[in-house]
């Protein structure tokens, strides 16, 4: 009897070791699932409360519990939770009393990273209004479109972006839009100032009755994403979605004594949903910078005692490419949250800057599925978690890149790919994993839905991303499909770029696509152009045109002049061969041009330019 007991005890003692040998990620998988399940239970309980518990409630609790704790660090300025609370009260009152806004209205914000962005957003939440986060890089037609599709009544804009707003001012005034500079004065006719009105009103708390109609399904934010066709689309972010966005910071172990350094633009979901809102939930501190600077990055980390950083893959590559310094490891950063990090850059970053815990993740602003590399497998974006997959239904399906559509079998259903093969990520649309769609774009919302995927009547979200699951169940990002590519951390819609280039008088037809550049994340823009008869290419005119209408990351850096632009059997532009051929003048016999920022024109692409790009002596 005693020997049997000893045998059982020995078995229990060695069980964890045996499990670890047979299933090395078992305990990590279980731990991750339990954390994610806890987030889900918590969010669902928040939604059942009346009124629903939004992210604002978490902020108000932190402001009451730790009023004097630093919330925002910017340059040499420190704002506490209480100060931001009072300032956002003034914002809500000014919007209510002077601008006549009420819950359910939408306000568009066009400004860079600064403390005002945060307390303007909190003021809008206190009033029950939604905020549209406009990309300050876009101009003219795209900017006007982004404003109009969200149904905003008011535009709040930074004075530094005066030229951008004045360009569309007549159209805004025609639509009876109220425009205000986030300043105390205005020198533009038709644009008023806002901060002087904020200064005049009380800092007293805002009555809950001002936001009494807000529920979990109420739109809180509109964040813009370039999709597979056309102009940017406004992804609708509900108050429920904001809570799920903070899940990453909970799973990664963000703490109240952390200082989070954000250089990513606030109009991105990463900085807003994960950075700002994650900080609020943890009761931590945010250190802000208007724009990323590789030379100042670690100095800022030391200045603000930063412990957590946010990144996109490009950002960490810039840091690795910066000149080495003796104090590269002299910092307190323990955690890095982000996506798009290549395996080689990951290794180089950790080797140079220390054993920083990197939490790579995969997600899309409007998507209903996300992954997290909680096992810290270099190069992966996540793992197939068996328990999670029992709750959330997703798959990788075969995709015909040439036809730009999923492959279907003889019965008309999609085909799952085996491990080791690349497939299109799709996730079933359910109450637990909803797809809220795009504001003012029903057709584009429908295009992101896949019907009759595995059986008649089922409905899935089409991520537009190609991923691969290896034989250890790790998930790897492969590429985007269709007419979108990613460069400098931004999605670029090829049709929007093509429409812009096509407005130039000597251009007959345009085919825009992204090409790979060695040692760079994403793909850089390239355009194949067919000239109009009896017209000559003008590199200076084309440069000026795209500089006026496209942000820098969307401008085609390479041009290829072709006599004929090939199309598919469904009359779509053929891109695969062009993508594979890239921009090497030794391979391509067509006329090639390179966008020269210094000369402010497109110049002939030479071997010297190509070699300089390959050697990374010419920055793109």
Curated annotation (Swiss-Prot):
Residues in the Cytoplasmic compartment per record: 28-106, 283-620
Gene Ontology molecular function, alphabetical: arachidonate-CoA ligase activity; ATP binding; cholate-CoA ligase activity; enzyme binding; long-chain fatty acid transmembrane transporter activity; long-chain fatty acid-CoA ligase activity; phytanate-CoA ligase activity; pristanate-CoA ligase activity
The protein's Enzyme Commission number: 6.2.1.15, 6.2.1.3, 6.2.1.24, 6.2.1.7
Residues annotated for AMP binding in this entry: 222-233
SUPFAM superfamilies: Acetyl-CoA synthetase-like
Entry GO terms, CC: cytosol; endoplasmic reticulum lumen; endoplasmic reticulum membrane; extracellular exosome; peroxisomal membrane; plasma membrane; specific granule membrane
Keyword Cell membrane: yes
Presence of keyword Transmembrane helix: yes
InterPro entries: AMP-bd_C, AMP-bd_C_sf, AMP-binding_CS, AMP-dep_synth/lig_dom, ANL_N_sf
Modified residues (N6-acetyllysine): 291
Pfam families named among the record's database cross-references: AMP-binding (PF00501), AMP-binding_C (PF13193)
Residues with PTM Phosphothreonine: 577
Keywords for the protein's UniProt record, in alphabetical order: Acetylation, ATP-binding, Cell membrane, Endoplasmic reticulum, Fatty acid metabolism, Ligase, Lipid metabolism, Lipid transport, Membrane, Microsome, Nucleotide-binding, Peroxisome, Phosphoprotein, Transmembrane, Transmembrane helix, Transport
Subcellular location: Endoplasmic reticulum membrane; Peroxisome membrane; Cell membrane; Microsome
GO BP, one annotated term: fatty acid beta-oxidation
Enzyme class: ligase
Coiled coil: none
Gene3D superfamilies assigned: 3.30.300.30, N-terminal domain of ligase-like
Function: Mediates the import of long-chain fatty acids (LCFA) into the cell by facilitating their transport across cell membranes, playing an important role in hepatic fatty acid uptake. Also functions as an acyl-CoA ligase catalyzing the ATP-dependent formation of fatty acyl-CoA using LCFA and very-long-chain fatty acids (VLCFA) as substrates, which prevents fatty acid efflux from cells and might drive more fatty acid uptake. Plays a pivotal role in regulating available LCFA substrates from exogenous sources in tissues undergoing high levels of beta-oxidation or triglyceride synthesis.
Family per similarity comment: Belongs to the ATP-dependent AMP-binding enzyme family.
Protein name (record): Long-chain fatty acid transport protein 2
Lineage, uppermost ranks: Eukaryota, Metazoa, Chordata, Craniata, Vertebrata
């Amino acid at each position: 009897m005693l020997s049997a007991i000893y045998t059982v005890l020995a078995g229990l003692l060695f069980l964890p070791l045996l499990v670890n040998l047979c299933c090395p990620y078992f305990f990590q998988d279980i731990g991750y699932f339990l954390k994610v399940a806890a987030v889900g239970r918590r969010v669902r309980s928040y939604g059942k409360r009346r009124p629903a518990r939004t992210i604002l409630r978490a902020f108000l609790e932190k402001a009451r519990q730790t009023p004097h704790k630093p919330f925002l660090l910017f340059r040499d300025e420190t704002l506490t939770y209480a100060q931001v609370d009072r300032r956002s009260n003034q914002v809500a009152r000014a919007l209510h009393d002077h601008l006549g806004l009420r819950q359910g209205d939408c306000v568009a914000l066009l400004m860079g990273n600064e403390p005002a962005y945060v307390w303007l957003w909190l003021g809008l939440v206190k009033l029950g209004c939604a905020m549209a986060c406009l990309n300050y890089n876009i101009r003219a037609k795209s900017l006007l479109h982004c404003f109009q599709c969200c149904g905003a009544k008011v535009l709040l804009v930074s004075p530094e972006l005066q030229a951008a707003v004045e360009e569309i001012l007549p159209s805004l005034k025609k639509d009876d839009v109220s425009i205000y500079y986030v300043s105390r004065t205005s020198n533009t006719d038709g644009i008023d100032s806002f901060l002087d009105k904020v200064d005049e009103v009380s800092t007293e708390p805002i009555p809950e009755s001002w936001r009494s109609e807000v529920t979990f399904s109420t739109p809180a934010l509109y964040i813009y994403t370039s999709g597979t066709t056309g102009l940017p689309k406004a992804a609708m972010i509900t108050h429920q979605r904001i809570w799920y966005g903070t899940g990453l910071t909970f799973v990664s172990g963000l703490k109240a004594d952390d200082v989070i350094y954000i250089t990513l633009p606030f109009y991105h979901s990463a900085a807003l949903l994960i950075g700002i809102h994650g900080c609020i939930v943890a009761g931590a501190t945010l250190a802000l910078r208007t724009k990323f600077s590789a030379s100042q990055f670690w100095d800022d980390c030391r200045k603000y005692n930063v412990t957590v950083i946010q990144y996109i893959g490009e950002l960490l590559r810039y840091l690795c490419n910066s000149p080495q310094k003796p104090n590269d490891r002299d910092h307190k950063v323990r955690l890095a949250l982000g996506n798009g990090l290549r395996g080689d850059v990951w290794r180089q970053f950790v080797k140079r800057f220390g054993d920083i815990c990197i939490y790579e993740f995969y997600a899309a602003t409007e998507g209903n599925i996300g992954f997290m590399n909680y096992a810290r497998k270099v190069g992966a974006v996540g793992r197939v978690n068996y328990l999670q997959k029992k709750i959330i239904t997703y798959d990788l399906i075969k995709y015909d890149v040439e036809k730009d559509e999923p492959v279907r079998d003889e019965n008309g259903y999609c085909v799952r790919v085996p491990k080791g093969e690349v497939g299109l990520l799709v996730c079933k649309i359910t109450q637990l994993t909803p797809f809220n769609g795009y504001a003012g774009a029903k057709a584009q919302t429908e295009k992101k839905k896949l019907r009759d995927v595995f059986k008649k009547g089922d409905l899935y979200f089409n991520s537009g991303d190609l991923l691969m699951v290896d034989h250890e169940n790790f998930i790897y990002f492969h590429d985007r499909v269709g007419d979108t590519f990613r460069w400098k951390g931004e999605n670029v819609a090829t049709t929007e770029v093509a429409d812009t280039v096509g407005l130039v008088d000597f251009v007959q037809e345009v085919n825009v696509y992204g090409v790979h550049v060695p040692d760079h994340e994403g793909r850089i823009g390239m355009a194949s152009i067919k000239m109009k008869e009896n017209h000559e290419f003008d590199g200076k005119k084309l440069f000026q045109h795209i500089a006026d209408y496209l942000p820098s990351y969307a401008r085609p850096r390479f041009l290829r002049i072709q006599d004929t632009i090939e199309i598919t059997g469904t009359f779509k532009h053929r891109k695969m061969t062009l993508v594979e051929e890239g921009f090497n003048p030794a391979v391509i016999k067509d006329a090639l041009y390179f966008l020269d920022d210094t000369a402010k024109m497109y110049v002939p692409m030479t071997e010297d330019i190509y070699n300089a790009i390959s050697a990374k002596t010419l920055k793109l």
